[in-house]
Amino acid sequence: MAIHLYKTSTPSTRNGAVDSQVKSNPRNNLIYGQHHCGKGRNARGIITAGHRGGGHKRLYRKIDFRRNEKDISGRIVTIEYDPNRNAYICLIHYGDGEKRYILHPRGAIIGDTIVSGTEVPISMGNALPLSATDMPLGTAIHNIEITLGKGGQLARAAGAVAKLIAKEGKSATLRLPSGEVRLISKNCSATVGQVGNVGVNQKSLGRAGSKCWLGKRPVVRGVVMNPVDHPHGGGEGRSPIGRKKPTTPWGYPALGRRSRKRNKYSDSLILRRRK
């Protein structure tokens, strides 16, 4: 979708660049309410994810990540905004009467036909297993399963795309959007194409209120805090952090420290770490 610029009448509109308007009129049987409790707190009330709170109320859209309507063609009826993700979603009407939401593939328009199965053509929006003979090396894919039948878990954000680079034995080698190269079972399925709304990183909200509507709180630098609140805090005026390297509010090394847990079962499946 295109980026929309407003006429420069106020500072907020002068600096803003938002998506072109995509209406959302979700179906009642495909949505349900969700209770946002905690706002970044754990069960003890301690902040575990900072800068979260407030925001507009949302209704969750049930997205079909499994794509288990096999060999039944469906038609894209609407392209809608989803407040729970950066990507847009499509409402699909299948031939058997089923109606489901899927992630909007880049370039898909209203009226296009999609299908999922083991022997379906390699066209945008179709879902098929990585072992399919029709899926050649170099295919751009998204919504990739890690566990068979669990549904897509990889490459689901706006503009995300992975590439199939090899097939050998029972595994397929993928290059993920992060740059990581890893093995996936060839029986797992994926959707052909790239997730839509590629220009989401060109958006500029223009004002603090727009970010507040998204449930994002202000971010405060540690160097302007008091020593009781952050290791970088304290000093007179604009003072340095007083350490050789920057740290987190809890004193751990920041900016580049690897946070992945050791000895995970998937370590043997990762051929090259993310960038």
Swiss-Prot record:
One of its GO terms (cellular component) is mitochondrial large ribosomal subunit. One of its GO terms (molecular function) is structural constituent of ribosome. It comes from the Eukaryota. Pfam families: Ribosomal_L2, Ribosomal_L2_C. InterPro entries: NA-bd_OB-fold (IPR012340), Rib_uL2_dom2 (IPR014722), Ribosomal_uL2 (IPR002171), Ribosomal_uL2_bac/org-type (IPR005880), Ribosomal_uL2_C (IPR022669), Ribosomal_uL2_CS (IPR022671), Ribosomal_uL2_dom3 (IPR014726), Ribosomal_uL2_RNA-bd_dom (IPR022666). Residues 1-22, 226-275 are annotated as: Disordered. PROSITE patterns: RIBOSOMAL_L2 (PS00467). Keywords: Chloroplast, Plastid, Ribonucleoprotein, Ribosomal protein. Gene3D superfamilies: 2.30.30.30, Nucleic acid-binding proteins, Ribosomal protein L2, domain 3. Its main location: plastid. SUPFAM superfamilies: Nucleic acid-binding proteins, Translation proteins SH3-like domain. It is found in: Plastid, Chloroplast. SMART domains: Ribosomal_L2 (SM01383), Ribosomal_L2_C (SM01382). GO terms for biological process: mitochondrial translation. Part of the 50S ribosomal subunit. PANTHER family: LARGE RIBOSOMAL SUBUNIT PROTEIN UL2M, RIBOSOMAL PROTEIN L2. Belongs to the universal ribosomal protein uL2 family. This is Large ribosomal subunit protein uL2cz. It comes from Chloranthus spicatus (Chulantree).
